[in-house]
Amino acid sequence: GFEYVRFVSVLDGRTSKLCASLDGSVWEINDPAKRVPPLHPNCRSILVPVEKDGLLVGERPFVMDERRVKDIPKEERSQLIGQLDANTTFKEFFKKTDDFFQKEWLGPKRYKLYKEGRFDFDKFFDPEGRLYSLDELRKLDEKSFKELGL
C-alpha cells in the first residue's frame, strides 16, 4: 500500500483559507501531525494516497469564482472554469487568478499587501495554516502597513 498522503483542496473561491494553505502538503500516513479532513463544516478537501514524492497524475478542475458552477451564467463559464495539472496547489492557482478573484478571496487590505509585493501568499497564514488577523499581520510587518496606508 501507500505510505504517504497528500492534502487536496478544491481550487475555487469558496475554499477555506485553512484548506487553501494546506493544499499540496504531504505527510507519512502514520504521522500524528497530519491534518485529516473534514477540517470544518462543509469541508470539501480530501487526503489522497501518494508515493513519497507526493506527485499526482492527471488534471484537476478549477473554478475562478466564489459562486457555485450552477450559479455562474453559461456564457461566463468558459473563462472561469477549466483544468490544471493535478499537482497545482491552491497557492499556484491563486497566482494565476485575476485581480477580482484575488481581492474577493483575500479581502481588500490583504489584497493590497499581496499586490504591492509585501506579502507572499504563505505569509498570511500561521504555521498551523490559520489565517492571521489584520492586527496580527500589522504586528508582523508594521512598516508595510504604514507605507501602504493600511
Predicted regions and their residues:
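Activation/maturation switch segments at domain boundaries
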Residues: 1-150
